[in-house]
């Protein structure tokens, strides 16, 4: 059986209740290795510890070329705010075939469900 994909949630300034319900969290934990950090941006140490295994990144985590070079498995970066901060090397992400998506500005249940659906489909190469 294939290893479960690592989905990394770093959705500051969104809180846990805005990102997923307990049911969604439980389902994500069944199909993926789920790491999340709430209350502030994830510390660089936490990101660096997991960067090589992250397949789906949800949040505003800085992803310059140097970090993208380390992220061998990443398939998608899903922004949770209504902006496009210059903290991602968008050109390099595009060159590598990494999807950069946005669920912002709404964090309504339908949008959250769409993000979960994107994460599942990307993790299964659909």
Named regions from a protein language model:
Residues 1-54:
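N-terminal glycine-/charge-rich "phosphate-binding" loop or analogous flexible N-terminal tail
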Residues 55-126:
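Phosphate/diphosphate ligand-binding glycine-rich loop within oxidoreductases
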């Amino acid at each position: 059986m294939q290893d479960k994909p690592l989905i990394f949630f770093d959705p500051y300034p969104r809180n846990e209740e805005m990102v997923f319900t307990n049911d969604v969290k439980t389902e994500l934990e069944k199909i993926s290795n789920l790491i999340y950090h709430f209350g502030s941006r994830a510390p660089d140490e936490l990101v660096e510890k997991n960067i090589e295994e992250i397949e789906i990144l949800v949040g505003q985590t800085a992803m310059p070329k140097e970090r993208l070079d380390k992220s061998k498995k990443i398939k998608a970066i899903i922004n949770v705010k209504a902006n496009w901060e210059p903290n991602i090397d968008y050109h390099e992400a595009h060159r590598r075939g990494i999807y950069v998506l946005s669920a912002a500005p709404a964090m309504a249940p339908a949008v959250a469900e769409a993000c979960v659906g994107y994460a599942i489909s990307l993790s299964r190469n659909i």
